[in-house]
Structures are given as structure tokens and as C-alpha cells.
Amino acid sequence: MNTSNYKDEFNQLNKIVKSYSLNSLKDTLLFANNSKFKLPNLNNIPQYHNIVGLVNFRLNDLENSILDFEKAINLDPNFYSAYYNLGLLFFKTKDLKKSYSFLNKAINIKNDYKLARDKLIEILSFYEPEDENSNFISDIDKKIKQVPYEIDFSKEITDQQIINYFKNCKKVVLKNLEDLSYNKVQIYRTKSINLNCERHKAIFFEYNSIPKYCFECYKVVIESKNFYDLLKMSLIFDQITYFHKFNRKNMIDKKSETDVFKSIIYCQSLEEVFQVENETKKILSIYFDEQISIESKRGCHEYASKYPEYKKIFKKKSEMMLMPSEWLDNEKKYDLENTKDGFENSGVSHDTIKGISLNNFLVMNNWFNNQKIF
């Protein structure tokens, strides 16, 4: 349909997009619906349905969000942004097959669509497509999974073994992928539990209050003495079965003047975190000397900076900072404003597939570039 004479409609669409950036989601949705009532031809513009779909997606109204994105595609079958958004939406569900399929469609329409490419790479850490649905990205992922470690994980790992493995992976990737840039800098392996950190931090930054969930979020923090030991920890998290039952990640922490090479294991109780700390020390004694730091902590750095008492951890919970009861009201306000039904959406968590992936390699490559190695 020709929309070239829809000047008023596109001006109004720009106002809706601006509202999406500045105002609450529910106010933006009301504004968008009222706009369509005043200017019915907005219904003929795919970008209108796409922005409404994004609002509904963030409000966790997935059913209406899907309908909105599908309307955009019906109006313009080559509207790649709507396919991408459907890929993001289904990633938030258990249907990774649909997520992969929609992202694949977005890339087929726009070959240089890097956002879709990067999300597709991430999905391949959790999902293996059938051969008939493979594409050049999944083919690279399969090839890198076939690169042998040539490492004995029952004894100490040398720096040279890590270097050799990374170089072998890079040879495989460079044969098939020109652009090694990637939008992630942490290797995050998940298991069953969605920590929902995005919601919790949004509440903290809006209200200066720590959500209830975070008072029961504990972690074992491992600080490696150098970059190569961080790489070793990444492979150990993948290969040692004990760690597979936990959410865990590897990262370079840049909050201080010098880089800190961190590996984190997330735990669900005070008792569990101390158990995991002790077991982790036993396991890692095979690979590292006593200089490695292994410590139990609670919550995120941002919370502890604002409330120093929060980070203090003791074996008796009664000695630790408790959550002020009035902070629960802030959570209720946030969920009321940011979800369709006013209730927290914890979403789903996908189990990471064991083994290296293109996602992991590209994060490591970002680390190497950051450390100016090779």
C-alpha cells in the first residue's frame, strides 16, 4: 500500500516513538491507541504496528505483541525489524525454534543485519537447529564445536594450551566469517533459573531500593590473577560437571582502575553459597595455586556501593542487613507501571549447551582485543 501521502500519520508516528523513549510504557500505549482512533490510516503503516508491538512486548503482553508484529509483516513482507522483534520475543519463551526461524528470516531479507546476526549467534548457545534449517552462522557454530580442546581437565592447564586452542578456533572462524565484532563481553552459562537481573536493577536505579529477590541472591566470586587464568576458568565452567547445575559467568570487570578477571557462580541460599565456595576451592586447587581469590558474596556491586551493610555476609542470616518492608511498595509500583497485569514476569531460562560455541569464541576474541593480545 502506498503511504507517501500520510504526512500527518508519520508526524504522529514520530511522536509515538518519542513517547516510547521518554514516557511510561502504559502512557505510550494509550497515546498510540488514541492516535490510531484520530488517524485511522496509521493502521496501514507497518512501523506503527512495530512500535506498538515493542510496547506490548516490554509490558509482557506477548499475545498482542505477536499480533502487532504480524500485522507489520502482513503490510510489508520485507519488514525485517518485525521479524527480528519476533525472534527476540520467542527467545523469551521456550520456543527457541521459532526464535531462530524469525531471526533467520530477518537476515535473509537484510544480509548485513548485525543485530539479528548477533542474536542468532547467542541463541546457538542454547539451540541446535535441524540441518534443513541451518544457515552460514549455524554452520560456523557447528565447525567451532568440532575443534578439539587437546586439554586434560584432570590436571593443571598451561597458558600455551589455552593459546593453541584459541588460535585453532580463530582459524576456523576466519575462514567463514569476516566480521568478528560482537556485542557481548561476558560468557554467561545458564541453568534453569532466570535471575531477572534487568528488572531488579531497573527498580534499584529508579527507587534506590534493592528488590526482595536480591536479598537471597548469593554468589561465589573467583578472581583470577591474570587473563589466561580467566580463559581457563571459562573452559573449566564448561567442562567440570559440578558447575553445570548453576548459573555462572566469566567477565573482565572494568569498574576499577585495573581490570579484574572474574568468574561468578550464582547461588540461591546462604547455606548453598558456603557449600559451593568450599567445593569450588577443592576443585580449583587442581588448576591454580593459592593466589586465586574465592569468596562468597551477596548481590551486585551497585547495591553494595549504595548500601555497604548489604554486602556483608555471615553464616547467621540474622546478622545480615534485612530488607526494609517499605521497599516492597517500590517493586509493586514498578511492576504496575511496566507489566500488563502489574505482576513480576520472571520469564524463562534456557539451559546452555555444553561445549564451545561461536558466542563464546567471539566473547573471548573481544577479551583478547581488549587486552591487546595477538
Outline where the language-model segments fall.
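Helix-start (N-cap) detector for alpha-helical repeat units in TPR-like alpha-solenoids
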Residues: 9, 46-47, 80-81, 114-115
